[in-house]
Amino acid sequence: YGSRAGQLHNSVRLLASRLDDATQILKQRIHQKPLCPQGQPNNKAKTVESVFFNVYIANVQPYLSSVNRGAEQLFKPLAELADIQQHVMPDSFRPYYDQSLRWDNDKGLWGKYQQQVKAHTEAWQDLLEQCGLRPTPD
């Protein structure tokens, strides 16, 4: 991402929103129409498992990792710099600092993003678990 802070910021905001949308769809499937009512894999389950590995694991997770690396390289140092200067921080800058730079603010950009990544991962695991296909770490 280099100096493209705005692009990274926008990516994180959009990712959090789209991950939340996708998580709601997964949860709806989990609770309203189980993928494997008998707890055994079926053709739909195999298709969903394929989407999980060929789309989410192969494409989405690497992109999330790229965004995380960019945030670590760009925004974490900015947050540290802002932290050091809190005693002279203008009141007009504080809302931006709280929402966009603070890593420890669960209601801010980074906190919401991390919550959505976690919730989305757990929803995938729960859906696949209905069929005995929950992925396990190697």
Where are these regions (language model features)?
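A cross-kingdom marker for long, charged
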Residues: S3-D138
